[in-house]
């Protein structure tokens, strides 16, 4: 079977969604077409370990390696969304995969006193 050919995209955008339970990282081209995707759950972490910073770092290293090797990506812009624990470590994982981060953007949605928040946790 022939090896799949990938188009060359030197610059891309990494969209990181960090929730309390998981971290999702997708890499797209500048037009917004998704090239590769990985989550902490897809990297082999299950249960509460998906929401850890280590799970986010492993997932972002995997997706960074995919983008670098398959699409010849060198520079990446990062857009972060969500309050999760894996925000910073996901960016660190992209850097350790050999991608140069050209800018960071925080796109966390903040309500202007919209919906009532869920009840406070009692542990």
UniProtKB/Swiss-Prot annotation:
Q: Which SUPFAM superfamilies match?
A: Translational machinery components
Q: Which keywords does this Swiss-Prot/TrEMBL entry list?
A: Ribonucleoprotein, Ribosomal protein, RNA-binding, rRNA-binding
Which residues constitute the signal peptide according to the record?
Answer: none
Tell me a GO biological process for this protein. translation
Q: Which GO terms describe its cellular component?
A: ribonucleoprotein complex; ribosome
Which InterPro entries does its entry note?
A: Ribosomal_uS11, Ribosomal_uS11_bac-type, Ribosomal_uS11_CS, Ribosomal_uS11_sf
What GO molecular function annotations does the UniProt record carry, in alphabetical order? rRNA binding; structural constituent of ribosome
Q: A Pfam family for this UniProt protein? A: Ribosomal_S11
Subunit architecture: Part of the 30S ribosomal subunit. Interacts with proteins S7 and S18. Binds to IF-3.
Q: Mind telling me which NCBIfam families this protein's record contains?
A: PRK05309.1 (NF003698), uS11_bact (TIGR03632)
What is the stated purpose of this protein?
A: Located on the platform of the 30S subunit, it bridges several disparate RNA helices of the 16S rRNA. Forms part of the Shine-Dalgarno cleft in the 70S ribosome.
PANTHER family in the record: 40S RIBOSOMAL PROTEIN S14/30S RIBOSOMAL PROTEIN S11
Give the family from UniProt.
Belongs to the universal ribosomal protein uS11 family.
Q: What is this protein called?
A: Small ribosomal subunit protein uS11
What's the source species for this entry? Coxiella burnetii (strain RSA 331 / Henzerling II)
């Amino acid at each position: 079977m022939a090896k799949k050919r990938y188009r060359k995209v030197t610059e891309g955008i990494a969209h990181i969604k960090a929730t309390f339970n998981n971290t999702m990282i997708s890499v797209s081209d500048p037009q917004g077409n998704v090239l590769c995707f990985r989550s902490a759950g897809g990297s082999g972490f299950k249960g509460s370990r998906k929401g850890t910073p280590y799970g986010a770092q492993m997932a972002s290293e995997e997706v960074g390696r995919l983008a670098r090797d398959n699409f010849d990506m060198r520079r990446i812009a990062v857009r972060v969304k969500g309050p999760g624990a894996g925000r910073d470590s996901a960016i660190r994982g992209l850097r350790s995969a050999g991608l140069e981060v050209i800018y960071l953007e925080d796109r966390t949605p903040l309500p202007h006193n919209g919906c009532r928040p869920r009840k406070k946790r009692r542990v």
